[in-house]
Design a protein with these regions (language model features):
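Local cysteine-cluster metal-coordination motifs and their immediate loop/turn environment
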Residues: 1-11
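Helix-loop-strand module that forms the ligand-binding subsite of alpha/beta enzymes
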Residues: 11-97
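Glycine-rich phosphate/pyrophosphate-binding loop and the adjoining helix
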Residues: 87-121
Length: 121
């Protein structure tokens, strides 16, 4: 939302239950991002979850490239499934994960598990 209430120790104005989840995210060593593949990318629910990670940032004293926030260092993994097995099936979802989670947020990639259900046809 960008209101910055969380950055000043105030309660979040977004009442979606994520505030209760924040201590668990901060305490976790590994965060597994799991989603069905929908329209060639992660689900809207997972994307909304990732976007809420803004509230776990802290001010960076020496910001690279003008970014003033820094995220805690965490390990991350991606778990996905889809109904087809084309070579490009996961391309957009993997790109989103690598750019957003690994490069922008700065989590350490611990791997991806992608499985198609083509054998069930």
């Amino acid at each position: 939302m960008g209101c910055n209430a969380c950055q000043y120790g105030n309660p979040c104005i977004q009442k979606d239950g994520f505030s209760e989840f924040v201590p668990k995210v901060k305490a976790a060593d590994l965060i597994v991002f799991a989603s069905l593949l929908l329209f060639r990318t992660i689900s809207a629910k997972l994307k909304a979850f990732i976007e809420r990670f803004y509230c776990i940032t802290e001010e960076d004293e020496n910001p690279p490239l003008g970014r003033y926030e820094k995220y805690p260092v965490k390990d991350a993994a991606l778990l996905m499934t889809s109904a087809d097995d084309l070579f490009w099936t996961y391309e957009q979802a993997v790109s989103y994960y690598k750019f957003t989670i690994i490069h922008y947020i700065g989590f350490h990639d611990k791997g991806m598990w992608k499985d198609d259900l083509s054998g069930m046809r």
